[in-house]
C-alpha cells in the first residue's frame, strides 16, 4: 500500500492541472486574512498536494464559485498544520488528529468571525478524510451553517457508509470515479484517482444549489 501511495505522488507530478496560480495563491487563505463574504468555501487538499488548496480539485471549485458569485466568495484551505503527508493515510481516521482539529477550527472561525456567511466545503483524497473527521464532531450550530460538502476520491467512503457521520446526506455529495479503489476502502491508487477535475463543474453546481 505504501508503494501505491508513493505512486500517487509521482502521478500527480506527471499529470499537472492547468490553474491560475496567482488567483489560487490569493484565494487560499481568505477566511483568515480577508473580510467576511456571503459564502465561505473551506477545502482540504489531497496527499502531497502543494499550497492550501492543492491542484486537483480545490482551486477549480474555488475559482468556479468566484466566477458564479463575483465578490461574494472567500476560499480557505486547511493548513499549514495539515501537511497532507502520505503516512497519515494509514492512521485509523485516514488522516491525523492535528489535521482534523485544524479543519474543525476553520469551521468554527467562519462561524464566529462571519456569523452571516454560508459555509460550503470540500476535500480530495486524504482531504476528504479530514472533512469526515472534522465535520462529524462539530457543534450543531456550526454544522447548521454548512450548506453543502463535496468530496472527491473519498478515502473514508466505504468505512463511513458513503456519508459523513452525524451530517445530513442531502448536504453531501461524494464523487467516486469508476476504478478508483480508494473509494472501496483500499489505499491502492489508480489513474481514476486523478480524474476528479472533470467533476468540478457538477460539484460547483451542487454547492451553489445549496446556498
From Swiss-Prot:
Which EC class is the enzyme in? hydrolase
The protein's predominant localisation is: secreted
Signal peptide limits? 1-18
Catalysed conversion reaction: cutin + H2O = cutin monomers
Q: Where in the cell is it found?
A: Secreted
In the UniProt entry, which residues are flagged as the active site? 125 (nucleophile), 180, 193 (proton donor/acceptor)
Q: Could you tell me the keywords of this UniProt record?
A: Disulfide bond, Glycoprotein, Hydrolase, Secreted, Serine esterase, Signal
* UniProt key word Secreted: yes
Family matches, as Pfam families: Cutinase
Q: Which GO terms describe its molecular function?
A: cutinase activity
Q: Which GO terms describe its cellular component?
A: extracellular region
Q: Which family does it belong to?
A: Belongs to the cutinase family.
Q: What is this protein called?
A: Probable cutinase 1
Which organism is this entry from? Answer: Neosartorya fischeri (strain ATCC 1020 / DSM 3700 / CBS 544.65 / FGSC A1164 / JCM 1740 / NRRL 181 / WB 181)
